[in-house]
Amino acid sequence: MTASAPRRPAAFLDRDGVINYNDHYVGTRERLRWMPGIAAAIRQLNAAGYYVFIITNQSGVARGMFSEDDVRALHRWMLDELNTQGARIDDVRFCPHHVEGTLDAYRVACEHRKPGPGMILDLAKTWPVDMTRSFVIGDSASDVEAAKAAGIPGFRFEGEDIDVFVKQVLIEMQRAAVSN
């Protein structure tokens, strides 16, 4: 991304519990079950002019369940699958660390691990993001806390229809923009 590109808002989406079901330690496509309506939700964000990013804690790496390469391969496949449905993900960040990991190299506290804002802030530095109009959607308190730590709103998705949920978030963000 070039620094001269116009700033756009971003939707930072948690992976497990928003993009796909949270089936714990999903490291391969064989274990991934898409959240119904996710492609439509992402297309909605694309049409509204948002960058769409995935931010995800992947402690399965720290626990030796799968490798960083496995996670990257899964993410490439996910982005390709979504793209065939006209749903574009612009970038992905994941944190493989966990203080209780079984692999020494990954047993560390890391600002990128949610609730830390590291993944959000890294993407905002890499892409021309308008943080004043950006938000996070996640399924846990740590996702909302990461949003707050990054200075943006966080919305907690609890398994309803993700397409309808995204529509409601976009309406709320538009209302907030008008009232400011």
Swiss-Prot record:
Record: residues binding substrate: D14, R15, D16, N22, D23, H24, Y25, T56, N57, Q58, S59, R113, K114
Biological or metabolic pathway of the protein: Nucleotide-sugar biosynthesis; ADP-L-glycero-beta-D-manno-heptose biosynthesis; ADP-L-glycero-beta-D-manno-heptose from D-glycero-beta-D-manno-heptose 7-phosphate: step 2/4; Bacterial outer membrane biogenesis; LPS core biosynthesis
Binding, Zn(2+): C95, H97, C110, H112
Annotated binding of Mg(2+), by residue: D14, D16, D139
Top-level taxonomic group: Bacteria
Known EC number: 3.1.3.82
Catalyzed chemical reaction(s): D-glycero-beta-D-manno-heptose 1,7-bisphosphate + H2O = D-glycero-beta-D-manno-heptose 1-phosphate + phosphate
Record's GO cellular component terms: cytoplasm
UniProt-annotated location(s): Cytoplasm
Cofactor or coenzyme needed: Mg(2+)
Broad enzyme group: hydrolase
UniProt-listed GO biological process terms: ADP-L-glycero-beta-D-manno-heptose biosynthetic process; lipopolysaccharide core region biosynthetic process
CDD domains attached to this UniProt entry: HAD_HisB-N
InterPro entries: HAD-like_sf (IPR036412), HAD-SF_hydro_IIIA (IPR006549), HAD_sf (IPR023214), Heptose_bisP_phosphatase (IPR004446), Histidinol-phos (IPR006543)
Predominant place of localization: cytoplasm
Annotated Pfam families: Hydrolase (PF00702)
Role noted for this protein: Also catalyzes the dephosphorylation of D-glycero-alpha-D-manno-heptose 1,7-bisphosphate in vitro.
Subunit structure: Monomer.
Name of the protein: D-glycero-beta-D-manno-heptose-1,7-bisphosphate 7-phosphatase
Species whose genome carries this gene: Rhodopseudomonas palustris (strain ATCC BAA-98 / CGA009)
Source organism phylogeny: Bacteria, Pseudomonadati, Pseudomonadota, Alphaproteobacteria, Hyphomicrobiales
Gene responsible for this protein: gmhB
